[in-house]
C-alpha cells in the first residue's frame, strides 16, 4: 500500500532512470545541427579523435553524447535511418550494464549500434550475441556499412569457419556471433596446445540480443566438449525391449497406498522412478536374458550400470515425445528447443538419454561421450568485464537478472503508443472444442483479409492444427523445426492480407512481421532490379498494407498458455509493432499441459463442473487468476532450479578458473623449468616423507621400500642403504638433500644429451597433456558426486556444503596427482644420443632383416623413448604435446 502511494508520488525506479536519461537525450539532440554540418571525412575523423581522448584519460561516459551523435548522423547518411529518441535511451541503458526491454519492431538492431560503437572505441573488442547464425549474419551485414564508414572493423563468428577466418573475426572491433559458438570457442581456447591456436582475446563487452532466451531459457544447458567413451550400444538396444513390458502407476507407493504398477512419473521434473514391483520385474527380465545371475541384485556394485540404462530407456519411452521434444531427421535424433521450437543440430542429451531415444526410434546409436570441458551460459557470460542485453520481454524476469547477473532491467517506452487489443483468454472443456473455436476465429479473420499468426507449443500440435485447417480448406503456412530452412520466407509473407501462419512457440523470433508483407524480401529475389520495379513493389505493398490496417492488423492466436508468462508475451509482441493496430487472444482447454501438470485434481474438477453444455466457452477473472497462479508456480520452480544449478556450478567454476589460468600461464611461457623445479622438490619431499617421516628415529625409516619406490616411479636407482652404512653423519635433512640432488643431476644429464630447448618443449607438452587428462577425469568424478549428493540430505547434512567440501578435497587430490604424474613422466623418459639411436636402429635392421630409417637423421640431437619406459598413451618426448601413438610412435610403426 505504502509502496504504491510512494510510486504514485515519486514515480517508479524505471521512471526516475528514464527522466535522468532524457536529459542526456536533449544534449545529444542539441549536438545534431553541428554534426549534420560536418563533411563525411570530418565525421569519419571523430573515431580517431575519441580514441585519442580516451588514451588521455577521458571516460566513455563523458564521450557518450558526442559518440551517439556521431553514430546517429552516420546512420542517417549511410543506412538512411535516424535513431529515435527512445533508441538513444536504449543505447544509454545498454552502455551502463543493464537490460533494455524494447517492444518488437522498436529497432533493437539499430539501437545496438550506439553502445557497440562506444565500447569498441577502447580497442578491446565488442561481442554482439545472437541466438542463431541467420541473425548474426543478417545484423552484421545490416550494420557493417555504418561501422566501416566510422572506421570500425566488423567480424562474424558462426560454426564451421576455418581457424584463420574465426581468428580474424575475433580481432575485429565488433564481432557478431552466436551464443553457443562463443562458449565453445572459450572451451576450445582452454584445450589449445599453443597460444597461437587460441581465438578469443580478453572478454570485454557483450551485448546479448534476445537476452532472456540465452541467459534464462538456456541457462541450464551446459556447453560440453566431449571425447569418446566406452561403447555400449548393444545394451541400449537390449534394454529398449524391456520398457514396453513395464506398467505405469499413477501414484508413488506409501504406507497407506501400495500400487500394482512398475514405475511412476514426475512430469514437472521429467523424471521416472521404478517401484519395488518394477525393480523385481526388471531383475527377473535381466536374469532371463543373461545380463545378471540369480545371486546378483540390480543395485549390486557390479550391476549398478544397468540401473542407469533402465532409467534412461524409461525416460525415453515415457517422457520424451517424437515431434514434441525431438524429431528424426536423416536417421538422427535432433533435439527441438522447448522455448523456441527450433532444432538444435549437434546437441545431444547427456546421461545416456540420447542413446536411449536412438534405440527407441531404431536409428543408429552413436557412442557415449566423456566430458573434456564444460561451462554453463550463466558462468560464461559472467566472465565479461561488461555485460548488457536487450529483448522485448524481460520485465517478468527482472528479479532473476538482478539476482544472478547483477543486471537491472529498464523498460524503454515505445516510439508510438501501443494500440494492440489483448483480449481475455477463453477456456474450453477439451482440446477438440478448443480447436473448433480457433478454426472459426481464423475463418473470420481470413474473411476480412486480416493476417493471423497461430502459436503452438509443439511440432505435434502445429501439425494437428494444420490438418484441421486443411479439412476446412484454409490455405496456411507452417513454421516449425521441420521447416526451419524456409523460416525467413514464411515470416516475410506472414503479414499478407488473409495470410495464416502456424508457428511453434517463438520460431521466427528476431524477424519482424511487416503488415502487407515484406517488399524488401521480394526485391532481394530480383536480379539487379530497376527503379520502376522497386516502385511497383512498394506500390503493391502499400495497397496490401492499407487493406491489413483496415482489417485490424495482425491477429495473434495462442493455442495454450506456456509455462512462462514471458513466452506468452513474446507471442503477443509479434503484433502491434511501432503503433500498428493488432489483436491477440489465447484459447485454452483443461487438456493443456499447464493445467494437467500444475493444477491439482480439485481445481480441475471444479473447473470441469463449470461447463454446463458441450463446447461451451468460459471467460472469467477467476480463470485468469487460476492461470496466473499456475504460471507463477512454474516460474518460481524454474527459477529455483536455475539458481540451484548456479550454486553447484559456481563450485566447479572456481576450479575451472584456477585450471584455465594455470593452463594459459603455461601457454604464455616458453620456459617452465622453474615451475618443474619447484614441483620436483615438492614431489620428492612428499615421497620421502612417506618412508622417512619428519623428525623420526632411524629405526622408523623404511629405506628398502623408499629405494624400490624411487626406482619404480622415477627410474632413480639409488643405494640409499649403502650411503647410510658408509656415512654415519647422514641424518634426515642431508639425506633428503642428497636424494633430491641425485634426481636433479640425473635430469640435467638427460638435458645435456637432448639440449635445453628440446627439454623445455617436452616439459611443456607433458604438463599440458597431464593437466588436460586429469581435469577430464576430475570433471567425470565431479559429475558423479553431484548426481548422488542429494542423498546426504537424508543424513541431516546440507548437500551444497557437502558438495563444496568434497569437491575441494577432490580438486586438491587432482593437483597432487598432477605434480606426481608430471615428475614421474619426466623422470622415467629415457634419452640417448644420435649415435646410440643409430646403433640400435642398425641392430634392429640386422635382426629383423628389414630396412629402418631413423626419424632423426638430420644430425641433430633428439629425444627417444624405449618401449619399456613410454606407453602409447604417454606424451611424445619430441615436445609436440601429442600422445606418443599419434606422433613419433605412429611414424615409427609406419616406417617399420
Curated annotation (Swiss-Prot):
Residues 882-896 have a biased composition (Basic residues). Transmembrane segments: none annotated. Its cofactor is Zn(2+). May bind 1 zinc ion per subunit. Keywords: ATP-binding, Cell inner membrane, Cell membrane, Cytoplasm, Membrane, Metal-binding, Nucleotide-binding, Protein transport, Translocase, Translocation, Transport, Zinc. GO terms for biological process: intracellular protein transmembrane transport; protein import; protein targeting; protein transport by the Sec complex. Zn(2+) binds at residues 876, 878, 887-888. It is found in: Cell inner membrane; Cytoplasm. Monomer and homodimer. Part of the essential Sec protein translocation apparatus which comprises SecA, SecYEG and auxiliary proteins SecDF-YajC and YidC. This is Protein translocase subunit SecA. It comes from Mannheimia succiniciproducens (strain KCTC 0769BP / MBEL55E). The gene is secA.
